[in-house]
Amino acid sequence: MIESSVLIKHRWLRTTRSQRCFLLLERMDHVLRACQTLCRHLPTMVSGMVVLVFASLSVQAQLAQVLPQRALKQWNIPPGNYSGITPLGNGHYAVVSDKAPRLGYFEWKIEQDSLTGQVKQVIPLGFRPLQSPATGGVADHDAEDLIFDAQHKLLWIANEGNQTLTAYNTATKQKVGALDIPPYLSSDSVFTNLGFEALAYDVLTRQWCSTSESPLRVDAPARPEGLSPTAPLDLRLTLWGSTFSAQRILPYRMAAPQLSRQARHYLHGVPALCFLPNGALLVMERELSVPRAYIGAKCHLRLRCIPADAMQLAERLGSRLISSSVTDSLVFSPSLLHALAPQTQVMDVAQWRTHLDVFRRSFANYEGMCLGRRLADGRQTILCVSDAQDGVGRCGVHLRDFLRVVVLDRECTD
């Protein structure tokens, strides 16, 4: 029989610094003792696995606190296709829609509780167009994410429609620059509608990070819905430097799928990225499964973190690019990607699932995230926004837009 006192001294707990983890040790002890009763009726190996799973889950769940989602409708914000969010400063946020009538962003003022982080109020301040119609403001676009460079007053937009990462001056509203896109991330290299969904910016190192939503054509034989459930989903997180050219690739392996792929709509990919104040990279993974009858739809979200020291280690392991002009001959083969991706250190921070069925109508397809306010106790909040597809629905059931706050434990950002 496995003694609970031994498990509480397990290395996972000894290396965990969360105060809430220590407060839960007593509760975990009760859980483990209950497991011991079950263990008497199970083989030794199986019982050990059961207890270790309980211990692992109890510790893992303490890296963040996921707060209840808040519907934007209560603040008279109309349904939209909100796909990205970024802080502008002083509680103001820019929100981009992938179906906006023209290129631009919505500005919201978001008030959060200083103790809990929960959203108290959202005030819509209008739509801010970028570029005049004469300079291409009504051109075909699919704005999926955005980041704000406060030092240079630039708003960078990830456009999946033409696979570009473009900067706009917030004063003149005009295009002023763009990141060089390496050939492996060109429109021809990504599966349809699985291109640039995410964009992040690190103010400390002044580097950008983006990726295709799902594996590239060269790295996977089919879209996620056409792959075996055991097939690895590896991405090339690409980082750009101050010269606007791609500098290196960070191999990244997504978590194993949890939902059924036999569905009307199925998605599995990375819709958002966010650099934390300490240089760590937060990755949002979204898996969505919508049955043919719609009832039973699920959206499973994960927040995973690549620690700052792991980012530096990956820099040494990853492939360095001399310039975007030579990336055609890049010796970063799919086999090398699949070999390196599992070596990138990743921490599971939080996860949640939304549903649409007879009794639950919490379904929300989260696509964007950014830094929220710091709480009074120093913890960092993350704001997540969902895409309701303009309130699509039928028979009186329509999707709603939500904001959800995730409160990170101090070890994620210190």
PLM features: what roles do these ranges have?
Residues 4-5, 18, 47:
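Serine residues within intrinsically disordered or low-complexity segments
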Residues 55-58:
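N-terminal signal peptide c-region/cleavage motif recognized by signal peptidases
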